[in-house]
Amino acid sequence: MAIILPELPYAYDALEPQFDAETMTLHHDKHHATYVANANAALEKHPEIGENLEELLADVTKIPEDIRQALINNGGGHLNHALFWELLSPEKQDITPDVAQAIDDAFGSFDAFKEQFTAAATGRFGSGWAWLVVNKEGQLEITSTANQDTPISEGKKPILALDVWEHAYYLNYRNVRPNYIKAFFEIINWKKVSELYQAAK
């Protein structure tokens, strides 16, 4: 059994105009597929550790040293992208009441949350991700990670994710990352965010 590249839960062009079909095709079929292939290649060297990436990345010290960085990069890349696709919706959704209340409690207002999340996504130098997570205390927190690092490795449970690698937006938005972030907020799958939030609490 190997890690499998999940199919997108919608057509490649379903998120247009916010996310264009060419970017989605390259992002899923090339970038994500490469993370899956490289993660499988690393895992094949140590079949004794299994293939549960969430468990492995929750405590990277348990990953054999010769494949540790490869799994952080590629296992993380797979988990991050598999989650990211599910957090996007072709149909515009309103934020669910439970998540809206939790955001108000944690950040004061949705606008304050959006401003802080945007700052995390804009301020991530180079490649990485912006996240809304449930931390170890059960509280909402905004964070960002470099490269394909996952908040799971810090004991946090991601409920919203934004890929800020240039490959995620450059064809459509060029170097204007803030416009890409703004577009992201128009296509969030809030039902999925709520599902993850309820499971993480």
Curated annotation (Swiss-Prot):
| Key words, A-Z | Manganese, Metal-binding, Oxidoreductase, Secreted
Supply one GO molecular-function term: superoxide dismutase activity
Cofactor mode of binding and number, as noted: Binds 1 Mn(2+) ion per subunit.
Primary location recorded for the protein, binned into one broad class:
secreted
Task: Identify its protein family.
Answer: Belongs to the iron/manganese superoxide dismutase family.
The record's note on quaternary structure and interaction partners says: Homodimer.
What's the short name of a Pfam family annotated to this entry? Sod_Fe_N
User: PROSITE patterns, per this entry?
Assistant: SOD_MN
- Residues binding Mn(2+), per UniProt: 27, 81, 163, 167
Task: Write down any Gene Ontology CC term.
Answer: cytoplasm
Q: Catalysed reaction per UniProt?
A: 2 superoxide + 2 H(+) = H2O2 + O2
Function summary = Destroys superoxide anion radicals which are normally produced within the cells and which are toxic to biological systems.
Per the UniProt entry, the Enzyme Commission number(s) are 1.15.1.1
The record's annotation in Gene3D superfamilies points to:
Fe,Mn superoxide dismutase (SOD) domain, Iron/manganese superoxide dismutase, C-terminal domain
Q: What is this protein called?
A: Superoxide dismutase [Mn]
Which lineage? Bacteria, Bacillati, Bacillota, Bacilli, Lactobacillales
Q: Where in the cell is it found?
A: Secreted
Q: Which InterPro entries match?
A: Mn/Fe_SOD, Mn/Fe_SOD_BS, Mn/Fe_SOD_C, Mn/Fe_SOD_N, Mn/Fe_SOD_N_sf, SOD_C_sf
Q: Which cofactor does it need?
A: Mn(2+)
